[in-house]
Amino acid sequence: MEKTDLHVNLIEKVMVGPSPPLPKTTLQLSSIDNLPGVRGSIFNALLIYNASPSPTMISADPAKPIREALAKILVYYPPFAGRLRETENGDLEVECTGEGAMFLEAMADNELSVLGDFDDSNPSFQQLLFSLPLDTNFKDLSLLVVQVTRFTCGGFVVGVSFHHGVCDGRGAAQFLKGLAEMARGEVKLSLEPIWNRELVKLDDPKYLQFFHFEFLRAPSIVEKIVQTYFIIDFETINYIKQSVMEECKEFCSSFEVASAMTWIARTRAFQIPESEYVKILFGMDMRNSFNPPLPSGYYGNSIGTACAVDNVQDLLSGSLLRAIMIIKKSKVSLNDNFKSRAVVKPSELDVNMNHENVVAFADWSRLGFDEVDFGWGNAVSVSPVQQQSALAMQNYFLFLKPSKNKPDGIKILMFLPLSKMKSFKIEMEAMMKKYVAKV
């Protein structure tokens, strides 16, 4: 689909503050919130909704209740209406000034069907969310953007952009579920938000106890990068999980299965020399790794980075089960050593991973974005908005739930060199055929 197929008209752009207004306060961010790869980044999502089948809802305007709900929920989440400031020691803090979150209302000249395959993120999606400048300081910028775009068919899209220093993906989903509750007329949140960033004050070690090779800078691939997706259905995933249980007497997650398959298929597709090593990075929610565990409602960053490594020859000659066990062990290692590994000095941290031997996985499939209901039912699809170049995203794999009209499973959204894309899909399909349940 060409970008010009979708035409969006901006109706209004305003700053929405908490209602009633709150006293100004200053809140400290945690050690993880202040990590270089977190404090200077944003993340975003599009939540796509079909028109309501209810006759009374066909002409209803979703922008009005969502805007009103935003003012109400900011009373519970004042940092999203504030601004970032840098302290004398270089850490960031949030001044809860009440300046507001950015809210945009827009109208498309098209029906929702113009977006085509909801699972296939495309350039037109960028019109559905106001893009904040990718500035590492984020001073004087809104920490939250909400854009509601209505379509002529009655469907709509809610685009959201969060500053990563204020929340992680789970925290963002928690906020959106609360926003939806307010939009539906609830007077009280089902889950009270908790700031308490002092609970995540980890020691910054003078010496690293582990070699953080996963952050070493590496050269980029110079080739056209394309974006597509691949779905692993739950029939295949469950069959593999059952096989692991029978052979090893261990449970494995859907993420571990999908990650192992992707790792092997990508390594084969890239034809990496057998003597080299390949690495995958993936985030883990560490809320339960603290002692005591972080409380329900905590919406700050609590993500640690796990790294699984293997020799190419061993990875490709071994079984899928072996790759799954390597990933499982890397998760156990991160959990055991979280407080010594999670925080390192900025000078020791380099997050440029543009190299064919290193890839990053992120799992959005269980965050609950698809369960956000503003009164029109759950989202039929959730998609990120590509605000960075495809070249910058070339080694990034995002795991999501497929759209409601697709088979249940895990959708892998990816950015790969054009010459490798076909080979990758062939390898994935071959593994699915090999491991599919015989019924």
Swiss-Prot record:
InterPro entries in the record: CAT-like_dom_sf, Plant_acyltransferase
Positions of the catalytic residues: 164 (proton acceptor), 373 (proton acceptor)
Listed pathway(s): Alkaloid biosynthesis; taxol biosynthesis; 10-deacetyl-2-debenzoylbaccatin III from taxa-4(20),11-dien-5alpha-ol: step 1/3
Family affiliation: Belongs to the plant acyltransferase family.
EC number: 2.3.1.162
Keyword Cell inner membrane: no
Gene3D superfamilies (UniProt xref): Chloramphenicol acetyltransferase-like domain
Keyword annotations: Acyltransferase, Taxol biosynthesis, Transferase
Designated name of the protein: Taxadien-5-alpha-ol O-acetyltransferase
EC class of the enzyme, as a word: transferase
Source species: Taxus cuspidata
Gene label: TAT
Annotated GO biological process: paclitaxel biosynthetic process
Coiled-coil stretches noted in the UniProt entry, renumbered to this chain: none
